[in-house]
Amino acid sequence: RPNDNIGLTIFAGEAFTQCPLTVDHGVLLNLFNGIKGDIAQRGLIEDGTAIGMGVANAISRLKDSKAKSKVIILLTDGSNNRGDISPLTAAEIAKQFGIRVYTIGVGTNGTAPYPMQTYAGVQYVNVPVEIDEQTLTQIAGTTNGNYYRATSNSKLKEVYEEIDKLEKTKLNVKEFSKREEAYQLYALIAFICILLEIVLRNTVLKKIP
């Protein structure tokens, strides 16, 4: 889907836009790869899990769009414990703006390695992990989306493929020529903001086989 506008919001105890909406997916990928799992431990962002703030940040990027399909994909491995906006309040706001939220709980309940700042530098310790599936299901239901559970990389890939099939919008392409050069004018068909809890790459994704 090379013509989709995609943005990236990351969150821990607070949320910010890592990449605004863009069709330049190479730039998006570079910014995604630049995320460091210990960003909270280095004091660059408040620690915790602010799901509501993450959704609200994505809404602010999507709410004025005239696109037929406006989607947020919320990816998290925990439960909300920070932020001024509750996840369900954020879901109601998304609904008002016609934004559908697909929620994905990744990993398994139990423990997972988490980066901690020590006198010797950042070290990983096992901390309890519990996915709030009830809240994630409610967020999806409120916005006419779906909740998915991904316990492996292969399952996560399947989830994204299913969402891709659900979010199909007819694309009208106009072609015109000038000085014997052909151009394609692509319509913007979907805005997708992927919310990524910043610890995923160094916690959950480490334990997923």
Range-by-range predicted roles:
Residues 169-209:
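C-terminal signal-anchor/stop-transfer transmembrane helix together with its immediate cytosolic
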